């Protein structure tokens, strides 16, 4: 992958040997990062198009950035389309149409590997799992949680883990509030519980009408035998099912379908996805694919479908509001990705399905309007940030750093990432820090340090972590981050914001000099009395300055800083909690791996061990009365 030619000259040189068959080509920039992936029925013809004169600005910009080019021959155009989709997903090239938010949808899982099956929320692949039944997908975790709550009210199946289930010797709160039949202490037998499992399965599969009819017959039978209390309970279940059915929006038009509506405004696109499973509306979610240059809705929808169904579960049919480019090839590629033989993608003209598509289109337009308002506001803020910090361009990626610790213990550093479209949580990073690492080998770099930082070094050039461990920890974070950026230059931030003061400026400058990097950065410290709105900004070669607390850009910077701070505290607490839980049991004389495992298995959790009485502790195999007293005393002291 080496060549002295670039741009159109490079493409001309590659045309000599380019084959006239189907395949995929990749364009790379000067850093050998993939910037575009394309497929072609005829590679030679497609590459020839890139040396024509009448190209749009996006294509011209892409060609100008191309320093290396590779192509792969495939057996058919469908294979080329499939390979193209996989490479786009893997490399996320900036000149391709991209589906940024591709996290998997959550499901409801009914576990079948236990005598008393558990209902729970599940996120991940379901095709290869055989330990349960899966219902969904749902558009959000909120939709799953709401449905699970309703199911618990109606059917009262357990939701606890096996460890918690096995540790019970009395009913938990779920039983008291009538959301569980407490099978853990045999308040219900296996046969009756199995009947409830059949009922909840029927409901989640959409057989609500048949279920209600069967329950009505059972209610009448119980009444005729004068089991009025049991009959009343089934009556309440029928009423609850009717209410949930009404609220869920059961559809007779579609049973198992994804409805997709694409709309466009000012070069921005929204694809609204409405999920229907077992005739029930499982929620809607808007996507905003990124696309550079001139594109069509047909092309956007094509790449959206290919990327979306690499991860999401396929329904029986996909209903769309717009034609799809290369529709037949797209169908074949999706079938191969999902290893199926049949797939329907339909564009309804009239009837019930057309009305559902129209509703989805209306929702898509509303979602796009809201997105554009937020996008415009973010653009204004980004322009202000560019001018405020003398950046060469409007920032695309801002990285915000903070750390959290207690006197150097349980230390973590974090990186939060934001851009034009808001926070990018997939790019968040956590750095586990060692408070014992000293900064050696930097003695030659200390001469130009800020005096505030320089005083933290001793005469041997070793960093004094007991005085300024916050500097030491941030230096660890930045060193690790810049090391990674050397490997991933395409993720270089436009700006770094550090939660720190003048001393941090010196640390950042020295570490960047060591790596021969020059990333714009600013340190943001709390003002007098740590009051919000009085923050101070520290930059190399500039006097410390503040901003009017009412300026939108100031409020935005506070939001960025607070997001990093919250993320740091959250991860610090998690680490501290894990360490404390581990050490509290491990430090008790007589508690080894086996007894600790027995305690956690019996009680189900560390909290349950802490809550246990001495009499409850001695019930655990291997725990004597004296050891139980020691455990109780130690845990309650800690």
From Swiss-Prot:
Transmembrane segments: none annotated. Its main location: cytoplasm. GO terms for cellular component: cytoplasm; excinuclease repair complex. GO terms for biological process: nucleotide-excision repair; SOS response. The keyword Nucleus does not apply. It is found in: Cytoplasm. It comes from the Bacteria. One of its GO terms (molecular function) is excinuclease ABC activity. Keywords: Cytoplasm, DNA damage, DNA excision, DNA repair, Excision nuclease, SOS response. Residues 209-244 form the UVR domain. Pfam families: GIY-YIG (PF01541), HHH_5 (PF14520), UVR (PF02151), UvrC_RNaseH (PF22920), UvrC_RNaseH_dom (PF08459). PROSITE patterns: GIY_YIG, UVR, UVRC. Residues 20-97 form the GIY-YIG domain. The UvrABC repair system catalyzes the recognition and processing of DNA lesions. UvrC both incises the 5' and 3' sides of the lesion. The N-terminal half is responsible for the 3' incision and the C-terminal half is responsible for the 5' incision. Interacts with UvrB in an incision complex. Belongs to the UvrC family. This is UvrABC system protein C. It comes from Rickettsia canadensis (strain McKiel). The lineage of its organism: Bacteria, Pseudomonadati, Pseudomonadota, Alphaproteobacteria, Rickettsiales. The gene is uvrC.
